[in-house]
Amino acid sequence: MNIALGQSALFLGLLGALAGAGSLLVGLSSGRRSLLRAGQGYIWLVALGAVLATVAMQRALITHDFTLVYVDNNDSTFTPLIYRITAMWSDLAGSILLWALVLSGYLMAMWIRFRKRAYDPVVVWAKVTGYVIAAFFFGLMLTLSDPFTRVHGAVPTQGPGPNPLLQDRVLVAFHPPLLYLGLVGFTVPFCFAVASLVTGQVGQGWLFETRRWSIFAWTCLTAGVVLGAWWSYQVLGWSGYWAWDPVENSALLPWLTATAFLHSAMVQQRRAMLRVWNISLILSTFSLTILGTFFTRSGVLESVHSFTDDGGVGPTLLVFFGLVVAICIGLLVWRGDQLRTQGAIESPLSREGALLANNLLFGAFAFVVLLGTVFPLLVQALNGSSITVGGPFFDTMTMPIVLCLLFLMAVAPVLPWRRASGELLRQRLAWPAAAAAGVLAACVLAGLRGFWPLLVFTLAAFAGTSALRQLVVLVRRVGPRSIAGRSGGGMIVHLGVVLVAVGFAASHAYQHQALLTMSVGKPASFQGHTLVFRGTKTVTSSGRSSLIATVDVDGHAYYPAIEQFALSNQAVVSPAVHSTPAQDIYLALTSVPTAADPAAGVAVYATPLVMWLWVGGLVVVLGALLSLWPSGRPRAGPAEERSRGHGVEPHDSYGSVGTGEQETADLPEPGKTGVGAAV
């Protein structure tokens, strides 16, 4: 039943996507409104197909239906219910099914949002693009990566279960879905960008329609990346959280281009400039999600996160990526004349100048990450050699970019549009500069050393104080409710980024570690802490056996463990972590006591300020959610204002708060907040 239901549902989804795209295309070419109306309704078939296929897969996993190859490979009778549910996205075919489910949800939301604009060419072409993308993924599942393939021969009675690493924390129930909500979410802005190019309507319309979709997707992707780092820290036993792994980079790349887009969009909204930048960034963001999907699902790059592909999915994804890039470039060339604008940046010391620099920096960051990720593939393709590009390359190349971005985070929000005077900058940056100098002095007096971390702390104080200043003045001028809006939310995002930067710098520069051989009852010293090994015990539960050590650290008990799953040969290290705002103590077993050697090997790490990474990530997500909150009536772009005869540019609230006449002029009316970009 599960196989029949699942495969029928996939066919229904593919049929709905093809019929919807065909109906809309014929309706556009013939001008028949009945076909345009009918074309909208096929989204129900796409969504129904994705939902029914998901129900069939979940039913198969929950009931241990080992007639499915997917269940046989990823389930066992010992697997707890929560991990049976999450097993749907623990392997290749199921992860593509999750992608199709999330995509159909976004397409349904797009249909609901724009249902009253059934005859708008931009909306119609956006839906056609969405249908084509959905058809590709449903077709992929029906051909090369069928999650409902039947087991040939005797039906097994037991499977190996999910990867043991995916059965250690319930974070696996949230981390991948959030990543997919983020990555797949950029499909909607991509569809509208393509539609605007096809129709030639490349002005402000597509940007206005997709702003909230972009921020929501960016928020989910940010939350997914942060949770992924937390999972790595809590589960893998290496005390790290970011290894520049190819799959980690695959999520980071679209995040970088999307962040650049959200900033750059403000310039087009305010000055009708950077059209090529904005549409290229959103096209690049979607293209990079497809490239990342190829990296993850092709097996060409080694990663603890990647899937094994033995059915041709990787080459198909690569061809799809190539087609997407070729079509995007072709559309940009075709509409190049219409995308060019007459406006020019009058001064580098202006908000648009700073945001253009921001684009260049994020672009450079993305290029470095992409180069380091694909370089081993290029070398292998050229001469057959196998090389790796590790953390030192990425750290060395990206650190200067991060420092420049921190500086821009402080300066850009206080800059006015068009040009700024030196006196204005001195006035608005006096307190942030003083705070930065104070933090640097305090760090030196506290005995902290190291050029890079001290520079990060200084610039973080500069940027953080600038964001706080903006928030304070905004609340004074507009009222407390202005926090829940685009300007307030954007500054809260900046505060979160500052916390992440501080946590990252401190945890990298000042971490201490040691590998201790500990006998029962004998104390050991580490960085001013006293550790005492109290012994081990074995705890057996359904399908797993855990050898748990007890180690006292300054009188507090820690319980690092090594877990062995009954149906897997892989032993999993389960670290013990005690977090405080100042420092984390992290313990991981490296060897267990035996009759011949009763001592235990314990890796111990003291990592300062790492908690602020997670706090900062939470603040970033909170700020992004606040920026989605309705913040007053929308303001028109410059072209719309001029068409009404006002000749006055609209307000953009991002960073336009402070003291002085020019800042006051930027503020919205009392009781209203502005409509600048959120991040």
Residue locations for each model-derived region?
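Membrane-interfacial helix termini and the short, flexible loops that connect transmembrane helices
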Residues: 22-39, 66-70, 102-126, 193-210, ...
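A conserved hydrophobic secondary-structure block that centers on an alpha-helix together
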Residues: 11-22, 28, 95-229
